[in-house]
Amino acid sequence: MKESVYYVGLNANNAIKNEDFFAGSFTLYPTQEKGNINFLTDVPKYGDEELFSKYQEFCNNKIDELLEQNPNTKIMCFNKKAKKLCVKFKDNFTKSNDDKLVDTLNNKFEIRELVKDVVPILNYFWIDDLTLSYEEIVQKFNTTTFVVQAVTGAGGTTTYFVNNSKEYDDIKNRTGKFCISAYIKNTPLNVTAIICDDKNIVFPTSAQLILSNNKNFMYVGGDFIYGAKLSDGVKKDIAKYTENILNVVKGLGYRGIIGIDYILTSDNTVMFMEINPRFQASSFLINMELKKLGLPCLAELNYKALNGIEIAENFESVTVDFAFLNCNQNTTFSQFENVDKVTQGYYEKNPTSVYRKIYNYSVLNNDIFEHI
C-alpha cells in the first residue's frame, strides 16, 4: 500500500498549505484542512501536563487505527515535544535531523560562533556573569540602548528592548544567561531555504513585521513585496551570506527546511542574527505560490531533502507578491485593507490561535513596525 505521511504536532502552523503532500494532520484544534484529526473543540479545563498526557493518549489511539488501515503510514514531527507525543511509533517516524544538532542551531550563541567567519554579525556580548551591572554594559558598548536575547526562543518572545537599569535587572533575574548587543535601527529580514545533499534551494526574502510590545519584539507577519524591492547590492549580499551559512549548516549534517534571520541597517549592511531550523511563519505564503506553479510544497521538499531523494524541479521563477499579518479578530490591523484571509489553522475558541490577513502591497513602512 502507498505510503501516507501525517503531520503530528501541538500547533497547526507547520501543517497548513501542505495538503498536496500530507495525508492528514494531528493537531490540538481543528485546522480546516484535509485529513485533520483534532483533539479539542473547546479550551481545556486542565493544566499543560495533563493536556499533553491526554493528547498523547489520543494520538496513540488514532495512529494505531491508521496503521491498521495502512501499515505504511508515516509520521512527521518537527520538534522533540511532537516526537514525545507519539514516541511509541518511532519506527514509523519519517527521517529527521538529529535533536542535538537542532538544539545547536536553535542556540543563538552557538550558531553565531559557527558562522561568524562567513557572514557579518552584530557585535554582541554573552553574559553568564549575573553580577555584571547595567552601567558596566553601558561602558562596554558606549550606548544606553540594548537588545537582550535569551539562549533560545522564537517569534521574539525572549527578545527584549532595554534602555535603563531597572529593565536590565528585571530581565537578568528572569532570564539568566543571555546575549546582549547595542540596539541599531534596522529592518529585520528572513530567508527560507531547503538544504539538499547536492544543492540548496533558496526562496524569496521577506521583511519581518515586528512590533515592539511591552519591551518585547513580537513577530506579527511578513512582507515579501518589500523583500523583492531591496537594492541589487543588498540582494547580492543576502544571496552570498545565505549560501555561506547553508553550507556551514550542511557540513554539520543538517538537511531540509531552515530559516535564516538577518537585519538590514541604514547603511545597507546585512548582518546575520539567528537560524530557525523549522518551518517559518511565512511558509504558507511560499506554499501558495508553489501550488500555483505546480511545484512541490515545502513539506514534500523537506521530506525529500531529509531522505536524499532528488529534487529535479527548478525554483528560480518563484516569487511571492504578498504580505501578511497575524490576526485574531477582524479589528486587528484594521488600518490596512486586506485582499484575502487564510484561516486554515485558526480556531476561534483557541485564544492563542491566529488567522492571516493577506495584502497585495507592502505594509512595512508604517511606524508601528521595526524598519530603517
Language-model-derived ranges and their functions:
Residues 300-372:
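Peripheral (often C-terminal) accessory segments that flank ATP-dependent C-N-forming ligase machineries
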Residues 104-186, 196-199, 224-247, 372:
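Active-site nucleotide/adenylate-binding loops and adjacent lid/helix of ATP-dependent enzymes
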Residues 185, 193-248, 276-303:
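ATP-dependent carboxylate/phosphate-activation module, predominantly the ATP-grasp catalytic core
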Residues 36-140, 154:
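Conserved N-proximal alpha/beta basic substrate-recognition cap immediately N-terminal to
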Residues 1-12, 73-77:
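Short hydrophobic beta-strand segments
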Residues 6-27:
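N-terminal basic/disordered segments at the start of proteins
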